[in-house]
């Protein structure tokens, strides 16, 4: 019982890859990064379909929601995505990490890791889906931008981990027991 409901007056950008209809539902004034999102979807579906298993749905869709929250999440076939971390992100500085591309690849990867392959309902289960989605997105990122960009992203993630670890109140658990610790 894991679903999402979104509603709005959307423009829709579409394309197809590997027999899968890719769709991005977006506010009419927020189209600047939509081609980038479609490319990340196309690359992630292509990579994971060949490396792991065919995509299990006929459609993969991203749906914009207002920036009152700042996240993206993967539901079966549908990925709600905040306007603030994708649709209106300024990507003109090409020396920075393309977080729009990476986050889309990561959320698409959850169509395999978390929706096709599920861990048991127990402490630490999120580690499987998150680490495999992370790995998949890193492989897609490396293929698109090269090893140096992937290493730059890993440095960013290391720094994020160290910041989160410094604020941790309950201590660091073994990986098999991690839950609700976003920095890990």
Region locations from a protein language model:
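Acidic/His/Gly-enriched intrinsically disordered linker/tail segments
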Residues: 130-184
